[in-house]
Swiss-Prot record:
Disulfide bonds join 109-208. The gene is mnmA. SUPFAM superfamilies: Adenine nucleotide alpha hydrolases-like. The keyword Transferase applies. This is tRNA-specific 2-thiouridylase MnmA. One of its GO terms (biological process) is tRNA wobble position uridine thiolation. Pfam families: tRNA_Me_trans, tRNA_Me_trans_C, tRNA_Me_trans_M. It is found in: Cytoplasm. It comes from Malacoplasma penetrans (strain HF-2). GO terms for cellular component: cytoplasm. The active site is at 109 (nucleophile), 208 (cysteine persulfide intermediate). ATP binds at residues 7-14, 33, 134. Catalyzes the 2-thiolation of uridine at the wobble position (U34) of tRNA, leading to the formation of s(2)U34. Its EC number is 2.8.1.13. The record marks 135, 348 as: Interaction with tRNA.
Length: 370
């Protein structure tokens, strides 16, 4: 009997994943990861903890995970990757933010923690054959090319391949995604049917393993406020004050706090060296902020580089894919050209697809306006 370790988070997805694997005849064991501690990590503005009567969120989730595993009749272990998460995910995330980039900590977390440190620990300590998670994705072995492929899930709205774009062959070869052929609605129905208390638990949002926070207040724990001018680029007049240029992205409309004028303004330029945020109310300038070409550095090809350079491109998890093509400039530096202009930001990830297969992804280094 093959042994599978399931990363149990306390959420409905990982819980149902464990149940399905038991149903398929695997020897299943759950492992709960704690990767963030607001006290160790000196998080003072933690509204989420206050709302739970000072009970750490990890403890709250662990209690749920324990009840799930008791219900399913499987063993649950608990491990701690707080230091690894800080060193490999959170510090790089902060460094990118300070540079005015738009980093994606969820992608780093999957690469270095969930499918990195977690995989390594489980294989070294639990004598297992596979690791399973509650991600909405799929993996298959392509015999023709002798590689493992990462596939989109049945539930396209919940598909998480965007966040898995940095995985490699070794990680995929030992991974199982039990929810590949299920919708979120079906997952909740299964959980309810088998009597799991978390069947209607709210989906987790926010930064990976940190949870829901007021994002700006949260970052103020680690990045000093650096107020500066907000200037209307069309009139050169100062229209407000920002709390730190790194909190804003090109094209952003919400959160500018410009009084009655807020709704008509959007960010059009960031002068990082002089700490000035430029805004405009001229909608025609939005087109000038859009790009048809973007270059990715450190692009990760999950399997192989396809001969056909026409691809579907996702520039953020929540956005529909667009058509385009790619050109390899050197090593892992890849240039993408979009069929239509898109507003993008350096640091943001581009993820490429062909016929439902996630080919890989990488952070945007720069972009060329149309």
């Amino acid at each position: 009997m093959k042994k599978v370790i399931v990363g149990i988070s306390g959420g409905v997805d990982s819980s149902v994943s464990a149940y399905l694997l038991k149903l398929r005849g695997y020897d299943v064991m759950g492992v709960f990861m704690q990767n963030w501690d607001p006290y160790i990590n000196k998080e003072s503005n933690n509204d989420a903890i206050k709302s739970k009567l000072d009970t750490c969120e990890a403890e709250y989730d662990y209690q749920i995970a324990s009840k799930v595993c008791q219900r399913l009749g499987i063993k649950l272990e608990r491990i701690n990757f707080i230091k690894e998460y800080w060193d490999m995910v959170f510090e790089p995330f902060l460094d990118e933010y300070k540079k005015g980039l738009t980093p994606n900590p969820d992608i780093l977390c999957n690469k270095y923690i969930k499918f990195g440190a977690f995989h390594k620990y489980c294989f070294e300590n639990f004598d297992c054959d596979y690791i399973a998670t509650g991600h909405y994705a799929d993996v298959r072995f392509n015999q023709a090319n002798n590689i493992y492929e990462l596939l989109e899930a049945k539930d396209i709205e919940k598909d998480q391949t965007y966040f898995l774009c940095s995985l490699n062959q070794s990680q995929l070869s030992k991974s199982i995604f039990p929810l590949a052929d299920l919708t979120k609605k079906e997952v909740r129905e299964i959980a309810n049917k088998i009597g799991l208390d978390n069947w209607d638990k709210k989906d987790s949002t926010g930064i990976c393993f940190i949870g829901e926070r007021n994002f700006k207040n949260f970052l103020h724990n680690y990045i000093d406020k650096k107020p500066g001018k907000i200037i209307d680029i069309d009139t050169s007049k100062e229209v407000g004050t920002h709390e730190g240029i790194h909190f804003y992205t090109i094209g952003q409309r919400k959160g500018l706090n410009l009084g009655g004028n807020s709704s008509r303004y959007f960010v059009c330029k960031k002068d990082i060296s002089n700490n000035i945020l430029y805004v405009t109310s001229n909608e025609s300038k939005l087109k000038n902020l859009s790009s048809v070409v973007a270059t990715c550095s450190y692009f990760n090809w999950i399997g192989y580089v396809p001969n056909n350079n026409k691809v579907e491109i996702r520039i953020r998890h929540s956005k529909n894919k667009i058509n385009g093509h790619f050109k390899i400039l050197k090593d892992n530096v890849v240039q993408f050209e979009f069929d239509s202009p898109e507003v993008i930001s350096p640091g943001q990830y581009i993820v490429a697809y062909q016929k439902g297969v996630c080919l890989g992804g990488g952070p945007i280094k720069d972009n060329i306006n149309e």
